[in-house]
């Protein structure tokens, strides 16, 4: 899609995707990399990058938005409102871990536009819904502060994805996260 909401041609969509993927790789290695370096890594002309993104800030916003769109889709795919809470939580966790490792730089960027903020809020709201449902089902004690539980859960995901041991296989890592979240380490 363009900034005006028009759909891009298939070849233009591929170029944008190649630029975003290259930007993630290049910027993860060198956050000060230029648009020219990103164009080279994407295998496109510098003018193609400038035609698709008005400036570096626009590219960074598109990068973060693309990553958050994938996270939101992964969470939605776990059926947080209808699947049994622990099943939805496990699936969402595995889905997020599979995405997070590929978008380290993008997901570390602040929300710079309304769409990124909306996507983040949708992800957090789905998480809160699953936690509420898990508490109603008795999987989380009645007195637990669910906002705090979400913070702990997100910290576990982040540490798993970016910590020194790496995430490993997403399904096994999700099981490990939920085991620590629900049973502690004691």
Model feature map: region roles:
Residues 1-3, 91, 121, 125, ...:
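C-terminal peripheral helix-coil segments that are non-catalytic and often amphipathic
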Residues 18, 37, 58, 87-91, ...:
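Amphipathic alpha-helical interaction segments
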Residues 53, 60-67:
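Alpha-helical DNA-contacting segments of helix-turn-helix folds
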Residues 62, 73-101, 112-115:
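Hydrophobic alpha-helical connector segments
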Residues 87, 115-119, 136-152, 168-173:
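All-alpha amphipathic helical-bundle segments outside canonical DNA-binding/catalytic cores
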């Amino acid at each position: 899609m363009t900034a005006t909401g028009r759909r891009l041609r298939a070849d233009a969509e591929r170029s944008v995707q190649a630029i975003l993927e290259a930007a993630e790789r290049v910027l993860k290695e060198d956050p000060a990399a230029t648009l020219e370096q990103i164009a080279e890594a994407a295998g496109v002309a510098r003018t193609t990058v400038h035609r698709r993104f008005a400036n570096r800030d626009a590219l960074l916003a598109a990068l973060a938005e693309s990553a958050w769109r994938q996270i939101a889709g992964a969470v939605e795919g776990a059926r947080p409102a209808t699947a049994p809470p622990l099943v939805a939580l496990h699936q969402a966790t595995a889905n997020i871990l599979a995405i997070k490792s590929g978008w380290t730089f993008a997901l570390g960027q602040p929300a710079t536009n309304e769409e990124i903020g909306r996507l983040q809020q949708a992800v957090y709201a789905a998480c809160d819904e699953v936690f509420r449902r898990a508490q109603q089902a008795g999987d989380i004690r009645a007195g637990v502060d669910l906002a705090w539980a979400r913070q702990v859960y997100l910290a576990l995901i982040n540490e798993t994805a970016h910590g020194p041991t790496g995430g490993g296989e997403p399904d096994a890592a999700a099981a490990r996260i939920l085991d620590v979240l629900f049973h502690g380490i004691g």
